[in-house]
Design a protein with these regions (language model features):
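Acidic/aromatic-lined carbohydrate-recognition and catalytic surfaces
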Residues: 4-12, 33-224
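Aromatic- and glycine-rich beta-strand/loop motifs that create alpha-glucan
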Residues: 1-8, 20-31
Length: 224
């Protein structure tokens, strides 16, 4: 065991391994021949791993690609324009994804995760780790536009009005269906309420849930 004294500031470290003239390094990337300090291990003083997480079987879920439990909340083709193209609803889950796949949506949602809780428990899963679930125009949702609400495309769409974009139209001020879906308070509050029940069901089963919080940056669609 190695004892590393810590103060109040985070510290970073890596291992340097020497065998004769051969030098390599061990860090978050594994063993490398080149030193890359940005991938050093880190220690945050005062942080304590909760006991329930130690040794727990965790299952990470990229929600859009897991299971479609509610087709009524699927992102629609031409619902809005994002980065390099219009949003696209993908029907064939077995097709090879596009290289630029960020605006392709397969319809996976939180209802799909709920529907598969028995399956996950049968696998021995104790903790579900969800990739970001808050309002965002991408399928990965690391570019959040509203931290206060679960994205209705993952939750509940109870109010659904407005037009889709024409094939030639890249102006999202015309994306009335998208705007209604992700800003209408009925949809936002219904999605949050559904998520609360979802978490209760997970806890009732003796399982835990971890959310991926992305707080060091937001997306270009942000509400601020």
């Amino acid at each position: 065991a190695i004892q590393i004294p810590v103060g109040s500031e985070p510290i970073h470290y890596y291992f340097e391994i020497r065998a004769g003239k051969i030098v390599c390094y061990y860090n978050e990337l594994g063993v490398t021949r080149q030193l890359q300090e940005q991938y050093s291990f880190g220690i945050i003083p005062g942080f304590h791993t909760p006991d329930w997480a130690k040794g727990a079987v965790m299952y990470q879920i990229f929600v859009d690609r897991f299971y479609n439990g509610d087709s009524s909340n699927d992102v629609l083709t031409n619902e809005y324009f994002y980065i390099s193209g219009h949003s696209r609803r993908i029907e064939d889950w077995s097709k090879i994804p596009d290289n630029m796949d960020v605006n392709n949506f397969y319809g996976g949602d939180l209802q799909g995760v709920m529907d598969k809780l028995d399956y996950l428990q049968d696998l021995g899963v104790e903790v579900i780790y969800l990739n970001p679930i808050f309002v965002s125009p991408s399928n990965h949702k690391y570019d959040i536009q509203d931290y206060d609400y679960v994205d209705p495309h993952f939750g509940k769409i109870v109010h659904d009005e407005g037009n889709l974009l024409a094939d030639w139209d890249k102006d999202n001020t015309h994306a009335k269906r998208y705007i209604d879906r992700v800003t209408n308070k009925e949809n936002l509050e219904a999605s949050n309420a559904w998520f609360i029940d979802f978490v209760k069901e997970i806890h009732k089963r003796g399982m835990r849930i971890i959310l991926d919080g992305v707080f060091n940056h937001c997306g270009s669609f942000h509400k601020w």
